[in-house]
Regions:
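Metal-dependent de-N-acetylase/amidase catalytic core
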Residues: 2, 8-24, 82, 87, ...
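Active-site rim/loop-helix segments in enzyme catalytic domains that contact anionic ligands
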Residues: 6-115, 144-145
């Protein structure tokens, strides 16, 4: 069952105590978009943070072959991770054609078992982008297959355009980390990030901030098991 928004949980005690955090996104720039501010805050609290990319964004640059785009977007992601001070891991799915099958379940399960996180953040499962949905399903099933050995949280990417029906129950004030988040996000030069920040992030992060009495915030829902 998903946690219902019966009450706002704007405090951040829930962030404390995590030692190893994976942020698993479908494409280069998704982890940064979802929660780079929270990644930075978790690092400041002493956690090791890893950005995991399900695909390498092979279909994400008009006029480039998949191989060319993969090289460019992996380099951009590594640069962003350097800004954030986190490690980058690339899985082997293909942008625009992410799959849910036995082999892909095994790949995600192997990642979880190798990294041994106590916290994982990934896409909210209701999303207009197929790769985002696939990523969420694979992470959720890995959580189940590994005995729910980590806390699982969902976050949002371009809500309204991509993420749908997302009602957060947890917030993180990222005001002190937002400049660094934007610096990391801007490393994805091939994605025309300036426009995305102006059209989406400024509005969304201010709105989430209003929900928890902060200037800028990121929002989450925890996956619960009963």
């Amino acid at each position: 069952l998903l946690m219902l928004p019966l009450s706002m949980q704007a405090g951040e005690k829930w962030l404390q105590g995590y030692k190893k955090v994976l942020v698993i996104g479908a494409h280069p720039d998704d982890p940064e978009s979802m929660c780079a501010g929270t990644m930075l805050k978790l690092k400041a609290m002493g956690a090791e943070v890893v950005a995991v990319y399900l695909t390498s964004g092979e279909a994400g640059i008009v006029g480039k072959t998949h191989e060319q785009a993969r090289t460019i977007r992996q380099a951009e992601a590594r640069k962003a991770c350097e800004v954030l001070g986190v490690r980058a891991v690339f899985l082997t799915q293909t942008d625009g054609n992410a799959e849910v099958n036995k082999e892909r379940y095994a790949e995600m399960k192997a990642l979880i078992e190798a990294e041994q996180p106590d916290m994982v953040i990934t896409h909210w499962p209701i999303d207009s982008h197929r790769d985002h949905r696939v990523c969420s399903i694979l992470v959720y099933d890995a959580w189940r297959m590994t005995g729910r050995g980590f806390d699982l949280y969902y976050s949002e990417v371009m809500t309204g355009m991509q993420t749908q029906n997302f009602t957060p129950t947890l917030w993180v004030d990222i005001t002190d980390y937002r400049d660094k988040k934007i610096e990391a996000y801007l490393c994805h030069e091939s994605q025309e990030i300036d426009g995305v920040i102006k059209e989406y992030h400024d509005t969304m992060e201010r709105m989430r901030g209003m929900e928890c009495q902060a200037k800028y915030a990121e929002a989450f829902v925890q996956q619960l098991w009963k």
